[in-house]
């Protein structure tokens, strides 16, 4: 009977296998947004600029297996650190489960369809551009507030 309960409802984040952990990612792409931090206040601002390695259609990483070598500052979420990333969006499955909330209906694990995150307009698809298209000195002009 316990096997009929989805793993994300019966396991703690720390007890999940690597494949289970990876499958929690809904593919929204929000963690790949470039962020700016105010040096005085520490406040983090999201931009509509994404990592150069994001596929703008699927919102997936084109170099996922090599991402940490190619992008040294790439975010690595773990069960121990997920809640320390205060900038993670409310919709993030890792944050959702860490806070004890259920996965939403549009999450691919619930819907069985990886496109539901896009259909629900939760992903960044259609709202972002590659960081390569904007000089870094102009990134402040790309601060957004629709992320949360």
Curated annotation (Swiss-Prot):
A UniProt-annotated Pfam family: CxxCxxCC
Residues passing through the membrane, by range: none
Domain of life: Bacteria
PANTHER family: UPF0260 PROTEIN YCGN
Record NCBIfam families: PRK05170.1-5 (NF003501), PRK05170.2-5 (NF003507)
Family the entry assigns: Belongs to the UPF0260 family.
Name this protein carries in UniProt: UPF0260 protein Maqu_1608
Protein's organism: Marinobacter nauticus (strain ATCC 700491 / DSM 11845 / VT8) (Marinobacter aquaeolei)
């Amino acid at each position: 009977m316990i096997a009929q309960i989805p793993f994300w409802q019966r396991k703690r984040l720390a007890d999940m296998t690597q494949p289970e952990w990876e499958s929690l990612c809904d593919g929204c792409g929000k963690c790949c947004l470039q962020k700016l931090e105010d040096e005085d206040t520490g406040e983090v601002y999201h931009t509509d600029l994404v990592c150069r390695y994001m596929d703008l259609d699927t919102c997936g990483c084109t170099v996922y297996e090599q991402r940490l070598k190619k992008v040294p500052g790439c975010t690595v979420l773990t069960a121990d650190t997920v809640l320390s990333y205060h900038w993670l969006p409310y919709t993030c499955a890792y944050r959702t489960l860490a806070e004890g909330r259920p996965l939403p209906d549009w999450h691919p694990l619930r819907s069985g369809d990886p496109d539901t995150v896009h259909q629900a307009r939760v992903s960044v698809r259609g709202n972002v551009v590659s960081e390569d298209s904007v000089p870094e000195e102009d990134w402040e002009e790309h601060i957004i507030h629709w992320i949360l």
